[in-house]
Amino acid sequence: MQKILFVCTANIFRSRFSEEVYNHLAIRLNLSSRAYSAGLMVGHYKTRTIYAPALEQLELLNIVPKRKDELSIHINDLDLGQFDQVICMDKNEHQPMVRKNKNLINLDIEYWDIVDEPLVSRNIS
């Protein structure tokens, strides 16, 4: 089974949303692939569960989240060797964080351009 890791800053919005949508579609289409998610700065934010606007959007898509009440996961807490593909949601935001993390130096990462808008504030989330 192919394993994909979506990565954002806090693992409460973009990466969690991507994980839920991907897995919903993979199950529906009977694909041998699953998504997971993690954050680069988990612990710097108050909220550790999926962000309310992400839940609202999932509901609009008729997707029931599988990890709704689970806490966010820091990328350093995962065995990164188990993933076939690692995707950071926003190159401009995440590439500097990746470069500062010694655990990610040799990791092959694909960068997307999904900006955190509105920017999730640390004191809100």
Name these PLM-found stretches.
Residues 1-81:
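Conserved active-site segments centered on acidic
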Residues 22-25, 53, 90, 98, ...:
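Hydrophobic alpha-helical segments
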Residues 10-12, 91-94:
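Short glycine-rich anion-binding loops that position phosphate/pyrophosphate groups of nucleotides
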